[in-house]
């Protein structure tokens, strides 16, 4: 049997659409009905919808969506029809029926149900955010983030992002690499929400050589040479100086300790 590909799209977390999709999949023999589910949370623009449409076209996927804002729902409906894609609007028909029954218009606010347990769902939002904007994947996350972590490779950016997300902070991390120009938006946001992660040359050299060993590669690869590391550190210092953000040395710190330092700084500077 051909693998079933499902795209879950939502202007909130996407949990409702995913639960419905998985409930549907569970009604088929799992040994025969292989499936692949991709979640696209926080659909906020027509460009986000276009991305979902393109993936569905490329993979022949079914789109299962819960879009609350009328303009986003309409745009998705039009694009699905235009490209003759397979889709299910989970919320639309129910919202229309409820609206007709009570003779009132809905609030059309994505994620309103999550206010039933604001603290819990704030954490879920933050975790989803950290995944979506990990490793500088999408610069659109910069103005939305509570914290932006900057650092070269092997400075624990991703684990720190996830740890802080479990504390309900929306964190985006941006790798600083000489060959890649930092996103323009990095210079537009408040530098007080940026944290640069510094590491000593010696510690980074050891970490990278160990990483190469794990991959079955020799420790003479350019990735772990002193010249390459110094080049990256110099570039890092240059970018951090331009942004004007604080620097935390993570060379001798556990992730929890670094995270606590970050939280302390962010909370102190919230109102400034």
From Swiss-Prot:
Which EC main class describes this enzyme?
transferase
Question: One Pfam family name from the record?
Answer: Kinase-PPPase
User: What EC number is given for this enzyme?
Assistant: 2.7.11.32, 2.7.4.27
InterPro entries recorded for this chain? Kinase-pyrophosphorylase, PPDK_reg
Record field: catalytic activity: N(tele)-phospho-L-histidyl/L-threonyl-[pyruvate, phosphate dikinase] + ADP = N(tele)-phospho-L-histidyl/O-phospho-L-threonyl-[pyruvate, phosphate dikinase] + AMP + H(+); N(tele)-phospho-L-histidyl/O-phospho-L-threonyl-[pyruvate, phosphate dikinase] + phosphate + H(+) = N(tele)-phospho-L-histidyl/L-threonyl-[pyruvate, phosphate dikinase] + diphosphate
Q: Which UniProt keywords apply?
A: Kinase, Nucleotide-binding, Serine/threonine-protein kinase, Transferase
Care to name a GO molecular-function term for this sequence?
phosphotransferase activity, phosphate group as acceptor
Sites where the protein binds ADP: 151-158
Keyword Nucleotide-binding: yes or no? yes
Write out the function statement from the record: Bifunctional serine/threonine kinase and phosphorylase involved in the regulation of the pyruvate, phosphate dikinase (PPDK) by catalyzing its phosphorylation/dephosphorylation.
- What family name appears in the similarity comment? Belongs to the pyruvate, phosphate/water dikinase regulatory protein family. PDRP subfamily.
Q: Which PANTHER family match?
A: PYRUVATE, PHOSPHATE DIKINASE REGULATORY PROTEIN 1, CHLOROPLASTIC
* Protein name in the entry: Putative pyruvate, phosphate dikinase regulatory protein
What is the organism of origin for this protein?
Answer: Staphylococcus aureus (strain NCTC 8325 / PS 47)
């Amino acid at each position: 049997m051909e693998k079933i590909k499902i795209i879950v799209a939502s202007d909130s977390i996407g949990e409702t659409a995913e639960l419905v999709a998985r409930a549907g999949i569970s009604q088929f023999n799992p040994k025969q009905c292989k499936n692949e589910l991709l979640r696209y949370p926080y659909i906020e623009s027509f460009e986000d919808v276009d991305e979902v449409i393109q993936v569905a076209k490329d993979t022949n996927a079914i789109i299962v969506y819960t879009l609350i804002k009328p303009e986003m729902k309409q745009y998705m409906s039009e694009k699905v029809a235009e490209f003759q894609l397979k889709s299910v609007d989970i919320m639309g028909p129910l919202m229309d029926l409820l609206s007709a029954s009570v003779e009132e218009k809905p609030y059309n606010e994505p994620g309103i149900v999550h206010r039933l347990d604001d603290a819990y769902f704030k954490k879920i939002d933050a975790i989803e955010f950290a995944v979506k904007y990990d490793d500088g994947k999408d610069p659109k996350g910069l103005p939305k983030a509570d914290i932006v972590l900057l650092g070269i490779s092997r400075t624990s950016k991703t684990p720190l992002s996830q740890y802080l997300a479990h504390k309900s902070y929306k964190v985006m991390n941006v790798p600083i690499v000489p060959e890649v120009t930092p996103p323009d938006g990095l210079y537009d946001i408040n530098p007080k929400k940026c944290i640069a992660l510094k590491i000593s040359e010696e510690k980074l050299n050891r970490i990278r050589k160990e990483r190469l060993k794990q991959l079955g590669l020799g420790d003479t690869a350019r990735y772990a040479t002193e010249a390459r590391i110094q080049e990256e550190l110099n570039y890092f210092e240059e970018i951090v100086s331009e942004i004007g953000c604080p620097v935390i040395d993570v060379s001798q710190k556990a992730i929890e300790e670094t995270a606590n330092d970050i939280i302390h700084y962010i909370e102190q500077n919230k109102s400034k």
